Amino acid sequence: MNNEGSAVINEDDDTSLLVVILDCNVYSWGNREKSLQDAISGMNDDNDSSSRYNGSTTIGNNNNNNNNNNSNNNNNVNKRLINTSKNNYIGFNKFLEHFMVFINAYLMLNQENQLAIICSKIGESSFVFPQSNIDQYQQEQQELEQRQLNENGELLPTPNKTIQGQILAKLQKLDLEIKHDQTDILSSSFSASMSIALCYINRIKRETPTIKPRILVFNISPDVSSQYISVMNCIFSSQKQSIPVDSCILSQSDSTFLQQASHLTSGIYLKPQKQELLSQYLLTTFLLDTLSRKSLAYPTLKSVDYRASCFCHKRIVDIGYVCSVCLSIFCGHSSSCSTCGTKFSLKIDLRKQLNNNPTTTTSATSTVNNKS
């Protein structure tokens, strides 16, 4: 009887594991900071020019009043544009402030909640929290050297003892230098981050089978079509293990990969309209666990972009050729499948039709000659 009662309690346990994937692409965040600074500098230049214009002497009071009114109207328009850009987009430092509010609220829901943060950088991914044993030992040694005494001769506590201090200290030590031998220099390793997150969840579930895991992705970089296969494998793995993938899009354009991930895994896909209010979006949307989502209403996708990436050139295609054996997708016709090696034969009438109308493409038009 005791075992049955404990099993019921474990099933109703709301302990959750949240694995956060942060997009720390230096180029994407750098372009965001540059655009915000350019908008502010443009506003200052307009104010300087209008002030110099108003200080000059003109003939005719009517003309002077009209010019002043026009300059004031332009300033008001520029101010509205600056305020709109500030509300719609935020920088990395401001994002961390909103993110820390969300993390503290998540940990306050249940003292047994577990947290993991993975940083997706250029060409590699690494854990930000929890720290490894080596990093923790090195940090403790540095803290012992840097700790100071108070007036009573007692050691002062270090700020890195808190979770927030550990996360901020780790983010400050991130190596954001560019490696020239990389093929996709400007792209983040999102597929690697997803793989690390799934492996970490699998290890934690072995230790705590009743824990409820989910993944939250903060994305600001555009999709990389060359990572399509690996990303889709991670999405299907999450779907099979019933791990929701939530997506918070901070970029201007939507993410095709994350739309499919959130839709297939029953996660939440959200693109905040006003990023200045990001804390409210996070607390009211992404703070919901898997049990609460069954009883509460949350944002859902109206339409999902299911376009795939071709296996030959890694480009997003609307219509293409599909191998009926291994389901590989190609943007153009070929004599054989580069994935499984199956030979194709295209019908003559269809080939003539394609030659007469080269702009028309078809999907799954090839017939397969299986080798005996």
UniProtKB/Swiss-Prot annotation:
**Entry annotated with the keyword Oxidoreductase:** no
Is Transcription regulation among this UniProt entry's keywords? yes
Zinc finger intervals, C4-type = 323-340
- Tell me the Gene Ontology biological-process terms attached to this UniProt entry: nucleotide-excision repair; regulation of DNA-templated transcription
User: Which stretches are tagged as biased composition: Polar residues?
Assistant: 50-60
Report keywords, A-Z: DNA damage, DNA repair, Metal-binding, Nucleus, Transcription, Transcription regulation, Zinc, Zinc-finger
InterPro entries with a match to the protein in the record: TFIIH_Tfb4/GTF2H3, vWFA_dom_sf
Tree of life domain: Eukaryota
What spans are recorded as compositionally biased (Low complexity)? 61-78
Q: Which Pfam families match?
A: Tfb4 (PF03850)
Q: Which GO terms describe its molecular function?
A: zinc ion binding
One GO cellular component this record assigns the protein to is: transcription factor TFIIH core complex
Q: Where in the cell is it found?
A: Nucleus
- Disordered as annotated region, ranges: 40-78
Q: How does it assemble?
A: Component of the 7-subunit TFIIH core complex composed of XPB/repB, XPD/repD, gtf2h1, gtf2h2, gtf2h3, gtf2h4 and gtf2h5, which is active in NER. The core complex associates with the 3-subunit CDK-activating kinase (CAK) module composed of cycH/cyclin H, cdk7 and mnat1 to form the 10-subunit holoenzyme (holo-TFIIH) active in transcription.
Biological function: Component of the general transcription and DNA repair factor IIH (TFIIH) core complex, which is involved in general and transcription-coupled nucleotide excision repair (NER) of damaged DNA and, when complexed to CAK, in RNA transcription by RNA polymerase II. In NER, TFIIH acts by opening DNA around the lesion to allow the excision of the damaged oligonucleotide and its replacement by a new DNA fragment. In transcription, TFIIH has an essential role in transcription initiation.
Belongs to which family? Answer: Belongs to the TFB4 family.
Put simply, this protein is called General transcription factor IIH subunit 3
Q: What is the lineage of its organism?
A: Eukaryota, Amoebozoa, Evosea, Eumycetozoa, Dictyostelia
